[in-house]
């Protein structure tokens, strides 16, 4: 199923929006962990400019891809493809970037959007395989 996923600032989890004909544009799930195949990283420049102008967060960045069951065997082929971390900060970048190299990202074969607790604090990470 083709979806777009964004971090929901109010619910503190990922919202999954259907891009399929029947439920197009509707939030179909909220999850702490979302695996995707054939993903594209998207940022609305108009939304980003609004963040910069108003200094207030809004939903304008998301990942589009094919939703995968979390039970999918061999989702991560780490033996052959190293897992990397993606990040996005509208005050620093106009696109998603690799967290280490800071190079812009447009797409990835596999993505895992994950929320976790670390020392009493919630963090979200975007892992990807190029």
PLM regions and their residue ranges:
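Short intrinsically disordered terminal tails
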Residues: 1, 128-130
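Structural detector for short beta-strands of small beta-barrel domains
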Residues: 1-8
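A short, compositionally biased
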Residues: 8-15
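Acidic, low-complexity, intrinsically disordered interaction modules
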Residues: 15-121
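Short alpha-helical interface segments
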Residues: 124-125
């Amino acid at each position: 199923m083709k979806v777009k996923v964004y971090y929901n600032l109010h619910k503190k989890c990922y919202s999954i929006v259907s891009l399929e004909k029947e439920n197009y544009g509707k939030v179909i799930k909220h999850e702490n962990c979302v695996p995707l195949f054939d993903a594209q990283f998207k940022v609305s420049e108009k939304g980003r400019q609004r963040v910069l102008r108003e200094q207030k967060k809004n939903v304008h960045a998301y990942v589009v891809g094919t939703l995968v069951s979390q039970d999918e065997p061999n989702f991560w082929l780490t033996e052959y493809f190293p897992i990397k971390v993606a990040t996005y900060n509208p005050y620093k970048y106009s696109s998603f970037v690799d967290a280490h190299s800071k190079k812009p990202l447009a797409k990835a074969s596999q993505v895992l959007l994950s929320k976790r607790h670390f020392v009493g604090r919630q963090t979200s990470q975007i892992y990807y395989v190029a």
